[in-house]
Amino acid sequence: MENIMTLPKIKQVRAWFTGGATAEKGAGGGDYHDQGANHWIDDHIATPMSKYRDYEQSRQSFGINVLGTLIVEVEAENGQTGFAVSTAGEMGCFIVEKHLNRFIEGKCVSDIKLIHDQMLNATLYYSGSGGLVMNTISCVDLALWDLFGKVVGLPVYKLLGGAVRDEIQFYATGARPDLAKEMGFIGGKMPTHWGPHDGDAGIRKDAAMVADMREKCGEDFWLMLDCWMSQDVNYAIKLAHACAPYNLKWIEECLPPQQYEGYRELKHNAPAGMMVTSGEHHGTLQSFRTLSENGIDIMQPDVGWCGGLTTLVEIAAIAKSRGQLVVPHGSSVYSHHAVITFTNTPFSEFLMTSPDCSTMRPQFDPILLNEPVPVNGRIHKSVLDKPGFGVELNRDCNLKRPYSH
């Protein structure tokens, strides 16, 4: 009889945070919203808060960066560790150290699905439909996958069954699609700057932005709009038609997450050939099933917010069963290892985190070390051939462990 590898049990889980409300502005890391001054990601982007004039100029003005980065580390009995980062900050640390630890410690490093199911069910009474608790569960799940990969000596994508393509091609999200084209990306997605409170004038301004970028980028480069939950159905339909002459590939997340009927109406009334996409701020498997049933062309879960890699794999299966694409919200290595195994993810997102989008910068800088970035808009699978997710934790960051058990 052949010997079967004996896997260790998990000895301890630990949680740190960095950045957030008490830190200096611009910590970056897992909370990529936390950037310094004069950064495109915080420059008059339309949001659900834009209707309040005190909060329309900056997303940080209403507190988008108050949570900070959560870092979860799991240690096996043999001393090996896995870790991951997400956006949950100090409150996520409390949930891990004071509640979720009981479902993690003492389990085999391969018991990822069991731990995941126990975490989901044990937090159901206070997690609702996602949010902070789901971000925290996602971070734990990713850390477990990282540990499992390191213990068995395989990259996470091989644990999922292996790559279905040799490389991942990317579009870039940022304020300058024209610069993204020069860097070799297949497309560029811009934020909208105006919303229903701005009336038809807002539609004209955002459509003019798309027209200008179409002229700069030429006809064959993809252009998309990210509306970040800032619109209502009527406004979104008007904006979609105003941008149709400029060959907009898709219009994204126009409505708040739970407006499923609104997404169905938007899809029904969108210009022919223009895709309707959403999912970044959906936090449960059921919400993605409902989104899929309402005709979304592309589902866009964030693996750090939707329940982790374990849930992302299930979301991809739902999308595949309906002939839909799943293109995760940019999550660096945590989505790279997933999408290279999905047959219904022909491309992926890279979030430009340099202030003016003119240079390539790792998305979760500075918290991750050895984080890969696309070269000519692509990442080859060989770049991912390291155990786990293939990155290291930068312990020189100001990591704080406020709780223990």
Swiss-Prot record:
Obligatory cofactor(s): Mg(2+)
Keywords recorded for this protein, A-Z: Lyase, Magnesium, Metal-binding
A GO molecular-function descriptor: L-rhamnonate dehydratase activity
Cofactor annotation remark: Binds 1 Mg(2+) ion per subunit.
Keyword Metal-binding recorded: yes
Protein residues bound to substrate: 33, 59, 349
Reactions this protein catalyses: L-rhamnonate = 2-dehydro-3-deoxy-L-rhamnonate + H2O
Positions that bind Mg(2+): 226, 252, 280
Disulfide bonds: none
CDD domains linked: MR_like_2 (cd03327)
Name this polypeptide is given: L-rhamnonate dehydratase
Organism: Escherichia coli O6:K15:H31 (strain 536 / UPEC)
Upper lineage: Bacteria, Pseudomonadati, Pseudomonadota, Gammaproteobacteria, Enterobacterales
